[in-house]
Amino acid sequence: MKILSLSAFLLSLKLSLVGVVFSLHISKKAEREINKVFEIDNATFVQTLDQDIPGIDKDRLYTIFDRGNALGFAYVGEASSQTDTFEYLVVFDTNFAVKKAKVLVYREDYGSEIGSKRWLKQFLDKTPNDRFAYRQNIAAISGATISVKSMTNAMNNLMISLASWQNNGKPNKS
């Protein structure tokens, strides 16, 4: 019983500190999007990884909780555009199926069409076993070729890293 109490205490301590950790890497905009995806008012976020894994920095992947129940995961990444970078959010369910992909910050004058819901819906319901190929299962956008290829590569790299992590000891949440 004491071990369970200690575990509960440590989890609550981690949850209470997560606001500080989370705000360093994710914006209020991302937080609002995550709350909308899960139809909740105030999600809690816990850093999922204790250390970096190949392809994923530990401070970019979060487990999403509502009232102590794990709802899914959020990944905040950065990808290259023509002359700068853009930030994006990928929200997963507990089985790592994509529930939402969103471009959070796009810093270029051209190519911002990759932020459209219509284009990003191509990633919905995909899992770490799926792969993406520009002009095969990912549509091109005139004037946004570099950003489209960059987002496609970023999603591929994320899925490959998640698949590797799942296959090397991380338990599946199903």
Locations of regions flagged by a protein language model:
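Bacterial N-terminal signal peptides
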Residues: 7-18
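Positively charged n-region of N-terminal signal peptides that target proteins for export
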Residues: 1-7
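Flexible, solvent-exposed loop/hinge segments and secondary-structure transition points
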Residues: 20-138, 145-149, 153-174
